[in-house]
């Protein structure tokens, strides 16, 4: 990831976002409505809108995950470059459910981005954003500001790039889920699980 775009100012501002900026997420078909350039700009605008601390001004970071959609890894990489270009570190937790990303945001106390389009078909993808502690980002809590920054062109950042690291949160998340239910007194059951494409 170290050889990506330096900053967001090299991109043409994206217009006509009305169809993909929903109440609580960004969602559209890939690559017609949501592509790598837009993901890059959303990453930079997310950092700016939330005022996430840069490497030379604190210890800010964004945790990012994606579901099983084929476009996920490429969109995540571009979003991460947008975040890095604004001087903020990136923590990649890889393939995860939305609840898994929210758990990571809460456990690490960091803002997060989940690449998913929920129930929509595979040609769709989207970005659910949250503040530190898994507080949702909606139109009235950041999305409108992100839209304004993208429309105007995300300002360039001249400080050092953020760094990227991977972190496995699955074991911690599984332990957290097991703590929610006391199975010590449960009778023997046979359970069938539909893993939903692994998610």
Regions found by a protein language model. Give the residues of each.
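Short, glycine-/Ser/Thr-/acidic-enriched flexible segments
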Residues: 27, 69, 120, 134-135, ...
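An N-terminal, well-structured beta->alpha segment
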Residues: 5, 9-79, 85-86, 166-189
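Active-site flanking residues adjacent to catalytic metal/cofactor-binding acidic residues
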Residues: 24, 66, 116, 193-196
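Gly/Ser/Thr-enriched, mixed-charge loops and adjacent short helices
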Residues: 125-199
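Ferredoxin-reductase
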Residues: 55-132
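Gly/Ser/Thr-rich beta-alpha loop segments that engage phosphate groups in nucleotides
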Residues: 27-30, 96, 128, 198
